Structures are given as C-alpha cells and as structure tokens.
Regions:
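Non-globular, low-confidence helical/coil segments that flank catalytic cores
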Residues: 1-195
C-alpha cells in the first residue's frame, strides 16, 4: 500500500496524461484501484525502462532502473529516476534497496548519480542508502518520506549518520510534515508544513 496507495486519488483528482510505472503486478487493492483509475481516465501508462527520457518544459527526466526484468524483492522494482532542471539535479529512488544501489553504481558513472536532492530510499531504512551509494550521490538535500512513530523504526540511525557525515540537509516528513522543494535551476528552496 505504501508504494502506490495514493496513486489512484492523484489520477482521479488531477489531469494526468502519462503514468510511468515498473513492469510489476500486485494483487493489492491499491494496485487494482490504480489500474481502474488509469482505464477510467484514459491515462497512457508506460513501463519504466532504463535509458527512457522524458521532457516537461525545461525539466529533463531519465529512468535509471529497474535494471533487471525480475526481482525477488518487490521494493527493487521501484523506478529510479534522475531529473535535471537547469543546473539542479534530483534522484528519486523509491523503495529500491541495497542490491539495486549496487547495480546502479556498477551500471552508471558517478556523474549520472550525483544529485543535489535525494529522495532517500525505502523511508530511510537500513536496507537502502548504503555508504557507497550515498558517497556517489552526496546530496545537498535529502528527503525522507516516513510516518511518525512507525512500527518499522524508520529512518535508520545509520542512514541518518551517513547523511550527516556528508553534510546533507535532511528533511523528514515525520518531523516536518509536507515538504515542498522549489528550484529556479540554480538554487533550491525548501518549505515545510511544520517548520
């Protein structure tokens, strides 16, 4: 549910033309609602494939992963997306875990992974955000989407320590609520719900 739980509501509420999603299926109610919304609204669904690029105005988007056709771990199907707006770069890793991070390090030069903003993988879990991966990315800003007092203990203190060692500014939804980052292509501004 945490992977796509709100996707159908987004499609129902906004004018969504295209949906990029991994080539994975689920028997969950959320996935079923998503497919129903895609069909009902006539959204054009695309399978995320490495090397696919998209442009939205001056925003350039590239799919980096999933690199494999199948994974044992559902989290590893997460689309890993690199985005560039002017001179500012973003890396969105979904719930991809350490095995995908390792594959990304092997597949791409560090210049492809280096990003100003990182959406930290898997809610800051210890199963993601390895030291090697974070060193390749070294984000100026790291965003962790995580529920307050969650039963999983996310985010991991080890991940927080790694980000601190890199000097990253960390924003967490459990502490700050909604987080909005804006950029003009040169600078990044952050506004949070609770701060």
């Amino acid at each position: 549910e945490d992977h796509i739980g709100g996707a159908s509501e987004v499609i129902e509420s906004l004018e969504v033309v295209n949906l990029i999603m991994p080539d994975a299926v689920s028997s969950s109610a959320a996935f079923s609602r998503l497919l129903d919304s895609v069909e009902k609204k006539g959204v054009d669904a695309h399978i995320a494939a490495p090397g696919d690029t998209y442009s939205v105005g001056d925003l350039q988007i590239e799919i980096l992963s999933p690199l494999e056709e199948s994974y044992e771990n559902t989290n590893d199907y997460s689309a890993v997306v690199h985005a560039r707006f002017g001179g500012v770069t973003f890396l969105f890793t979904g719930d991809a875990e350490a095995a995908v991070e390792k594959a990304l390090l092997e597949e791409y030069p560090s210049s492809k992974l280096r990003s100003d903003v990182l959406k930290v993988g898997h809610h800051g879990s210890k199963t993601s955000s390895t030291e090697a991966f974070l060193n390749a990315v070294p984000p100026e800003i790291a965003v962790i989407e995580v529920g307050a007092d969650n039963s999983y203990g996310h985010p991991s203190q080890k991940v927080l320590d790694r980000l601190d060692a890199l000097g990253s500014r960390v924003y967490r939804t459990d502490i700050s609520g909604n987080i909005v980052l804006t950029t003009d292509g040169d600078t990044i501004d952050a506004v949070t719900e609770k701060d």
